[in-house]
């Protein structure tokens, strides 16, 4: 099962639930995707969406749904999705064992 191959922390789940509450729509799903860009070649993206596309992989945990396209999922397997708040701000963070290198800001990576 994919939910065991991609870990979602309690902090990430709590933040997603807060975002859904703010939008007043618990049917929304968090899409996580990888695009080209950033200083290391690839970067993560996050969006709330209503619709799951035909080939999306769906991970349901603690009442929230995360959707990932089939190309991005191969680069995220074994990873951990977290949400952190510190003096620099707050953000979703992905610990990705597939990344060969990450940039200093942690927003982009290379494979």
From Swiss-Prot:
Which amino acids does the record list as binding iron-sulfur cluster? 39, 103, 105
Which SUPFAM superfamilies does the record cross-reference, listed alphabetically?
HesB-like domain
Biological process, per Gene Ontology: iron-sulfur cluster assembly
The domain of life for this entry's organism is: Bacteria
Cofactors named for this entry:
iron-sulfur cluster
Similarity-based family: Belongs to the HesB/IscA family.
- Per its database record, what is this protein's job? Required for insertion of 4Fe-4S clusters for at least IspG.
**What NCBIfam families does this protein's entry cite?**
iron-sulfur cluster assembly accessory protein, PRK13623.1
Write the protein's name: Iron-sulfur cluster insertion protein ErpA
Species of origin reads Buchnera aphidicola subsp. Cinara cedri (strain Cc)
Lineage of source species: Bacteria, Pseudomonadati, Pseudomonadota, Gammaproteobacteria, Enterobacterales
